[in-house]
Amino acid sequence: MKKDTVLKGIILGMSLFLAIFTASAQGFLGKGYAYEQNARLGRGVNVIGYDPLWRDSSKARMKSKHFKMIKEAGFDNVRLVMMPFKFSKDSVDYAINPVFFTTLDWAIKEALANKLMVIVDFHEHSAMQKNPLGNKAKLLAMWKQIAMHCKDYPNEVLFEICNEPNMLPKIWNEIQMEVFPILRAANPNRTIVLDVINGNQIKHLKDLELPKNDSNIIVAIHYYSPIQFTHQGAPWSVKNKDLSGIEWTNTEAAEQAIKADFDIAQDWSKANNLPLTLGEFGAYEKADMPSRVKWTNYVARQAEARNWSWSYWQFDSDFIVYDMKTDEWVLPIKNALIPAK
């Protein structure tokens, strides 16, 4: 009888150990951990996606000082926009050129040194849209390399699976659910950001498949509505490139339209018990500045009212909050994002 009791105790102890080990291996840090991470993300900005530093560090626009300036301005995170496909030749293993990792490490370390959270964003939506199944193997292989390379970074670094996956929901769900365990295997405690089809649009949250038994997840949405305002004059936007002079005034109807969209997202967030990050929002420079300021401020405040983190699009290149030519902030946009206390 005593032997049976001891044996049962050993079995119970082993079972408990295995349960704890398994939970740890799946990144289990408590169901509220992703919400804690999202709160820490706070306010942020997209950086370095179109900076020549990826190919030639001597031509970099982004410097170490800019990470410090971002933090001092009141931002809490940077979304590192990376496009790794061009750093690999099509092959069996899609080995990534070490030059890519040199730049990625530099950016991550500069951000962390300035106490900024980091979202490592896989920004290959154009290639994935053109041939999602044909590029799937490359996406999986490259994420495996990046996940292994970054596995020792602290939990202040997050992974985002693929920006704006413009494809059928069934195809994207299958791809995203193949990437997810690759990331989780090498990074059991890292928060992973999931993406939503067709521009990370709120209306497609309902189409998103979620991993089972893993709550260390944040879901990314993007917001550029009304698109005729935010993308007027944008040369890549076929329907809006010839538009001009469209203003955004904070009328009750205009504000209510944004609130209604955000309420749909918030309802989804509550129903699925997952936090949201507004990974992109902004109005292109061809819109008038007063309208851009009003819209940007309103969108940011509405996101914060729902406890979402956000990352403005973007620091440099277009939609800018920082002018590299003059090496100074675009103050109306910066102040719309981070109002004076």
What are these regions (language model features)?
Residues 47-62, 84-97, 230-257:
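Acidic/histidine-rich helix-loop elements
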Residues 53-58, 84-101, 123-138, 291, ...:
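Surface-exposed, active-site-proximal loop segments in enzymatic domains
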Residues 67-76, 95-122, 129-158, 174-186, ...:
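An active-site-proximal structural segment forming one wall of the substrate-binding cleft
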Residues 140-254, 259-283, 305-308:
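Active-site region of glycoside hydrolase catalytic domains
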Residues 288-341:
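Aromatic-rich peripheral "rim/lid" segments of glycoside hydrolase catalytic domains that contact
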